[in-house]
């Protein structure tokens, strides 16, 4: 059992809790926290020194919707590659903020490669491995001094798997002196939070403004993550980065991330997220970006692309056509969004329905901006289309998919077209 955490009373209506008030952190052209929309970020899995491969993957992630991209900076070659990666991306018209992920030797790499220090939009620092023993404070200070020199924000990110062992041991010793000792899990959660908070306050003492700091304290368990972030959010006003350390592969990773992050987001906690999925063989790295966007959209935080409601199918829907049409519609609107974002702003808020029989089909279709109710088993071979709650037309024949796509495009142009003046 986890210790009870005081939380606000849920709202009476179907909305989320108000967003937590935090510092606003400027990262390149993106602002995190301060009431701004929750930001989607991702991380490459290329060798950063492979400039061509890294540029391609960053570009792919950006096109998929990642608003910040983190890259490993673990040696001199990767540090030297960063400014070249930034230059090549800008030549492609891509100005996405790049975050340098540092462990163990970040203080050395940034000092040796000032062009890297300048090119990065943010530094990620792990207080659990920034230095050990007497070197810890010195090396942490060198990283913060670099951030101050180049006016860069930092994320101080504590991780369950690389926790500051000296701090953990100290808290274990203190716990042993309690009249009623905490369980080991609570002590470790406190160590994780303290590692992040104490490091942040030390950075402020060294001269880094509070509005240049983001915090994270990641674990891999859903309930542990929720408990850690609720506690940390109640103890500071820093912007928070949400994510499981390792969510896992396939549906497990998606479900775990959604289970943890949706609870926190609905409570107003979290200013930027990453879904740390393990890609399945042959799967694009961009999948984690799509999942992050869908999580934010389904929880009502942001809108990225029109949402398609589709029934799961049952014995009344022996035809697979409605399933195929739902996929075609989803792919069409996702492919059109980069264009619509410019020419038809607001189209991302559109709702669509592709239903498979008369039971819920007409009702769900009326709730959507545009919906189609396809015939189920034994029903007449016709498909009524509803637009803004009213029956508009009945589609029949072999070209239902093309005609329905055409109606969607017409609706977008009619409803969301950017008007001159």
UniProtKB/Swiss-Prot annotation:
Its cofactor is [4Fe-4S] cluster. Its EC number is 1.17.7.3. Keywords: 4Fe-4S, Iron, Iron-sulfur, Isoprene biosynthesis, Metal-binding, Oxidoreductase. Disulfide bonds: none annotated. One of its GO terms (molecular function) is 4 iron, 4 sulfur cluster binding. It holds the Pfam family GcpE. Pathway: Isoprenoid biosynthesis; isopentenyl diphosphate biosynthesis via DXP pathway; isopentenyl diphosphate from 1-deoxy-D-xylulose 5-phosphate: step 5/6. Binds 1 [4Fe-4S] cluster. [4Fe-4S] cluster binds at residues 311, 314, 357, 364. GO terms for biological process: isopentenyl diphosphate biosynthetic process, methylerythritol 4-phosphate pathway; terpenoid biosynthetic process. It catalyses: (2E)-4-hydroxy-3-methylbut-2-enyl diphosphate + oxidized [flavodoxin] + H2O + 2 H(+) = 2-C-methyl-D-erythritol 2,4-cyclic diphosphate + reduced [flavodoxin]. Converts 2C-methyl-D-erythritol 2,4-cyclodiphosphate (ME-2,4cPP) into 1-hydroxy-2-methyl-2-(E)-butenyl 4-diphosphate. Belongs to the IspG family. This is 4-hydroxy-3-methylbut-2-en-1-yl diphosphate synthase (flavodoxin). The gene is ispG.
């Amino acid at each position: 059992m986890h210790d009870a955490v005081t939380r606000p009373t849920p709202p009476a209506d179907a909305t989320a809790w108000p967003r937590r008030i935090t510092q606003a952190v400027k990262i390149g052209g993106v602002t995190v926290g301060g009431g701004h929309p929750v930001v989607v970020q991702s991380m490459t899995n290329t060798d950063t020194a492979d400039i061509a491969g890294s540029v391609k993957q960053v570009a792919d992630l950006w096109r998929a919707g990642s608003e910040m991209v983190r890259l490993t900076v673990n040696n001199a070659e990767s540090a030297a590659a960063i400014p070249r990666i930034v230059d090549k991306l800008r030549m492609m018209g891509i100005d996405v903020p790049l975050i340098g992920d540092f462990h163990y030797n970040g203080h050395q790499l940034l000092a040796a490669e000032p062009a890297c220090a300048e090119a990065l939009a943010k530094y990620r620092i792990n207080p659990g491995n920034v230095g050990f023993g007497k070197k810890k404070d010195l090396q942490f200070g060198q990283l913060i001094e670099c951030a101050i020199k180049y006016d860069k924000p930092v994320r101080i990110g504590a991780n369950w798997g690389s926790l500051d062992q000296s701090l953990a041991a100290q808290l274990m010793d203190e716990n042993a002196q309690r009249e009623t000792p905490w369980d080991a899990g609570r002590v470790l959660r406190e160590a994780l939070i303290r590692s992040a908070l104490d490091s942040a306050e030390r950075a402020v003492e060294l001269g880094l403004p509070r509005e240049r700091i983001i915090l994270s304290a990641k674990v891999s368990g859903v309930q542990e993550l929720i408990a850690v972030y609720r506690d940390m959010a109640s103890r500071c006003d820093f912007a928070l980065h949400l994510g499981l350390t390792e969510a896992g592969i396939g549906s497990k990773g998606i479900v775990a991330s959604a289970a943890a992050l949706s609870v926190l987001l609905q409570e107003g906690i979290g200013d930027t997220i990453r879904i740390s999925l393990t890609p399945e063989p042959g799967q694009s790295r961009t999948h984690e970006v799509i999942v992050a966007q869908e999580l934010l959209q389904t929880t009502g935080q942001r809108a990225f692309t029109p949402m398609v409601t589709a029934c799961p199918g049952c014995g009344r829907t022996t035809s697979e056509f409605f399933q195929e049409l739902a996929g075609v519609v989803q792919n069409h609107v996702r492919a059109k969004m980069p264009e619509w974002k410019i020419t038809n702003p607001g189209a991302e808020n559109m709702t669509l329905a592709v239903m498979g029989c008369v039971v819920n089909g007409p009702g769900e279709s009326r709730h959507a901006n545009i919906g189609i109710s396809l015939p189920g088993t034994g029903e007449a071979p016709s498909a009524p289309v509803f637009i803004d709650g009213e029956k508009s037309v009945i589609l029949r024949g072999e070209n239902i998919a093309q005609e329905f796509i055409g109606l969607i495009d017409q609706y977008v142009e009619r409803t969301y077209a950017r008007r001159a003046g």
